Design a protein with these regions (language model features):
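Small/polar/charged residue-enriched interaction surfaces, especially the RNA/DNA-contacting tracks
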Residues: 1-207
Length: 207
């Protein structure tokens, strides 16, 4: 079995919110939280990162001369028995994903900003429409890990190119990030010998 571990390092370039329906006493649209060693820690689900990567992969696959039949990121909208590279890499209702993405725990402090809803018809603030949103501010850093199982060369090319494309893709509620690939990534030699993969890694390497 071929296993590659790709470490992603993110820096927020435009304030970032990942909306959730969980209850919060501080914000109407908070980050998800988990308690670790008695402390509440905000995190970004790995499924969120995976969804963004899938969106990027769909958009750029043709640049790598890869055929795409599945243009949705929602499992319920995917037809069964699809075998294009998107479903092979990211999974489908009848197909396991070849990648697992860990949740990204946030070391940086979040901030809460108050907003007001605007009446689209009259372009004025709606009465009693104040709401609070929890953001990760500009300059905040976080990371996560992608475990890749038995990827073909084409699949690894597409995955790494999709990571690069994340620099231009909306992250959460209109956020933007800069993403780099960590030096401590573990990528087998069979991938490093590929010129396209080597070029992407060279451009994306952190530091």
């Amino acid at each position: 079995m071929s296993l590659a571990i790709i470490k992603l390092n993110f820096e927020v370039k435009k304030k970032l919110n990942i909306g959730t329906k969980m209850k919060s006493t501080k914000a109407d649209i908070p980050f998800k939280k988990v308690t670790i060693n008695g402390k509440e820690v905000a995190y970004i689900p790995g499924s969120t990162v995976k969804g963004i990567l899938r969106t990027c992969a769909i958009r750029i696959a043709n640049l790598l001369n890869l055929k795409v039949d599945s243009y949705s990121v929602y499992p319920s909208e995917l037809r069964r028995n699809k075998s294009d590279i998107i479903c092979e890499l990211f999974g489908a209702p009848d197909k396991n994903s070849k990648i697992i993405i860990d949740d990204a725990y946030l070391d940086s402090n979040t901030e809460i900003l108050t907003h007001v809803r605007i009446d689209d018809k009259y372009q004025v603030a709606k009465e009693g429409s104040l709401f609070k949103v929890e953001y990760l501010p500009i300059g905040s850093k976080f990371g996560c890990e992608i475990k890749c199982y038995n990827l073909s060369i084409d699949e690894m090319r597409l995955l790494l190119a999709s990571v690069a494309e994340m620099n231009y893709e909306r992250f959460g509620k209109a956020g933007l990030v800069e993403v780099k690939i960590g030096k401590n990534s573990q990528i087998p030699e069979l991938y490093l010998n590929d010129s396209i993969i080597k070029e992407i890694l060279g451009a994306m390497k952190d530091g």
